[in-house]
């Protein structure tokens, strides 16, 4: 974990960041929360589902609730695209980080158009095939992190940092 954080900061060459952490509730949110040593002293906000685990874990955090379900749901993709435009215009993050799932897609594309750096962390349990979200955001990421060497065959420009969570 510390290696990842130092590496990320080195790559971005930014001392102070406004960070957007975007992810589905459940495991994706837990993974982002585990990056706390990185985001703890940063100006930050979250985008996730309005579910009990998210409300509990992020009770003292600035957060925006997105529309769900998101996986293969075109209606909510459109709604979340408009939400991304609204939230990102207001917040103007320097960096957007996600480990999935589909809610990350509109935030990454809109954020990239607005000049934010985007970093995607492919989930640990994917060691031989990509996630749909990973495939969709890979072309625009500033950094794409995988946790298995085998995944570099799928994502050649990815950085394998091993298990970071």
Each model region followed by its residue ranges:
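N-terminal subdomain of nucleotide-sugar transferases
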Residues: 1-49, 55-58
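Residues at the starts of beta-strands that form the adenosine-phosphate
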Residues: 18, 43-46, 62, 117, ...
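Conserved nucleotide-sugar phosphate-binding/catalytic loop shared by glycosyltransferases and other
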Residues: 23-25, 41-80, 150, 161-164
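Histidine-centered beta-alpha loop that forms part of the nucleotide-sugar donor binding/catalytic region
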Residues: 24, 101, 122-125
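An amphipathic, basic-hydrophobic alpha-helix
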Residues: 72-94, 113
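An aromatic- and histidine-rich active-site surface loop
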Residues: 93-114
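Active-site-proximal region of nucleotide-activated glycan assembly enzymes
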Residues: 116-165
């Amino acid at each position: 974990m510390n290696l990842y954080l130092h590496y990320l900061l080195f790559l971005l060459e930014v001392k102070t960041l406004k960070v957007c952490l975007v992810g589905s509730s459940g495991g994706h949110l837990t993974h982002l929360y585990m990056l706390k040593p990185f985001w703890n002293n940063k100006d930050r906000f979250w985008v996730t589902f309005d579910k009990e685990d998210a409300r509990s874990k992020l009770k003292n955090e600035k957060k925006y609730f997105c529309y769900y379900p998101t996986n293969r749901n075109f209606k909510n993709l459109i709604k979340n695209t408009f939400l991304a435009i609204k939230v990102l215009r207001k917040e103007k993050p320097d960096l957007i980080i996600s480990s999935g799932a589909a809610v990350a897609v509109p935030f990454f594309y809109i954020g990239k158009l607005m000049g934010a750096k985007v970093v995607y962390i492919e989930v640990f349990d994917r060691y031989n095939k990509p996630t749909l979200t990973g495939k969709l955001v890979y072309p625009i990421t500033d950094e794409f992190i995988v946790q298995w060497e085998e995944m570099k065959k799928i994502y050649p420009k990815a950085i394998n940092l091993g298990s970071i969570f």
